[in-house]
A protein has these predicted regions:
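Hydrophobic/aromatic-rich core segments of domains that either
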Residues: 266-345
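Short solvent-exposed strand-capping/beta-turn motif centered on an Asx-Ser/Thr pair
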Residues: 71-77
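Hydrophobic membrane-insertion alpha-helices, especially the h-region
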Residues: 8-23
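Beta-sheet-dominated interaction scaffolds and their linkers
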Residues: 28-71
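Secondary-structure boundary elements
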Residues: 173-264, 306
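Short beta-strand elements
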Residues: 139-177
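Intrinsically disordered, low-complexity Pro/Gly/Ser/Thr-rich segments with frequent PxxP/GP/PP motifs
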Residues: 81-128, 136-142
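Alpha-helical and coiled-coil interaction segments, frequently adjacent to or embedded
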Residues: 69-71, 82-87, 91-92, 139, ...
Length: 356
């Protein structure tokens, strides 16, 4: 009899512990659910919830996967037409969805109207706009609301957000091989080759990897010619500036066209590197942007297999030749510790395209 009571007591204790654990786990999961739900801003009753951004860095946005995620539901099953736009900056992104009593979600990314919409922000630096959301049923508007959003110029690089997420891969968007100014740069470099063949003995033309026939010295000569053309034909000067690495840091970075159309062009390290990388990519070669604390410089694969990479230091635009910039770039890379390497070809394959 005593043994029976003992095992009953043990069983009861196990049940109590299990029930307590179940309740605690349930409370934790419910708290997590409430935390997740509270990150969204409810609007239009219980139909829609969203968490609209308050800032939009347009230079990054053109390559971002989405702008905002809309959560939707309906007490009765029905088709909803959801549309999102930033008037005078984007087109409308819309979708027809089937709403049920459970929340579902969809990401939206309205397409920018065009380069003129991006360029309009360059002068003022930023502008306050409205993010417009509308939800319709088959016969009426169910929800129409807006949220203020600050649009920042395409020249503003947001290196990392408040959570510390690294945005440096988006710098590949500043590499613009199809820009008319880059076509002009390559053409003027070709003229420099013709006018000064002794300065580039291994290079006969600006032909990239020349279907695998270009030697490493041929490739080096082409990059040297580009750098010399920037310095001696365009009068481009190097301006010192530090790349910030603190959370939520921003920096003004001009596109190649912004700089090369100036009467007295000047560019900091990341800007001059992006100009050269643009020309290198236009030639069908593979550029890299190397980022170390406070600085950036150029890397170029010496063949189509990227079996070897050489480096160029654009701070040498203040008086040194392209060949010396190559020497100094090699030295810079050897002395760097844990550099951030942005492989432009890789980023293209993963959806980071030129801003223009």
């Amino acid at each position: 009899m005593h043994r029976r009571y003992f095992w009953l007591a043990v069983a009861l204790a196990v049940l109590i512990v299990s029930a307590t654990g179940y309740i605690l786990a349930g409370n934790y999961l419910y708290a997590q659910y409430q935390t997740s739900l509270s990150s969204y801003t409810a609007s239009c009753g219980a139909l829609i919830s969203w968490n609209p951004p308050t800032r939009l860095y347009t230079g990054l946005y053109v390559n971002a996967p989405s702008l905002v995620t809309i959560r939707y539901r309906s007490q009765t099953r029905q088709t909803l037409h959801i549309s999102l736009s930033i008037p005078q900056f984007t087109k409308e992104d819309s979708a027809d969805v089937t709403a049920t009593s459970s929340f579902q979600q969809r990401a939206f990314k309205p397409q920018v109207l065009g380069s003129a919409a991006l360029d309009a922000l360059v002068g003022p630096g930023h502008s306050v706009a409205q993010l417009h959301l509308q939800v319709r049923s088959l016969n009426k508007v169910l929800c129409d609301t807006s949220a203020s959003i600050t649009l920042f110029s395409r020249q503003i690089m947001h290196w990392s957000d408040a959570s510390g997420e690294d945005n440096s891969a988006y710098l590949a968007g500043w590499v613009t091989p199809n820009a008319p100014v880059i076509k002009d740069l390559v053409g003027r470099a070709a003229k420099r080759l013709d006018a000064s063949p002794a300065s580039y003995p291994a290079t006969k033309a600006m032909h990239g990897y020349d279907a695998g026939r270009a030697t490493p010295d041929d490739v080096r000569g082409q990059v040297d010619a580009l750098l010399d053309t920037l310095q001696f034909d365009y009068g481009l000067h190097y301006g010192s500036d530090n790349i910030p690495f603190t959370p939520d840091a921003t920096q003004l970075i001009q596109l190649p066209a912004d700089i090369l159309t100036q009467k007295a062009p000047i560019g900091m390290c990341v800007e001059t590197t992006a100009i050269l990388a643009s020309a290198v990519e236009r030639l069908g070669m593979f550029p890299y942007i190397i980022i170390v604390p406070g600085h950036a410089f150029l890397g170029v694969a010496l063949d189509a297999n990227s079996s070897a990479i050489d480096y160029w230091e654009t701070s040498d635009l203040n008086g040194q030749t392209g060949s010396q910039a190559n020497v100094d770039g090699q030295s810079e890379f050897r002395g760097s510790q844990n550099p951030r390497v942005i492989d432009i070809q890789y980023e293209r394959q993963h959806g980071i395209l030129p801003i223009e």
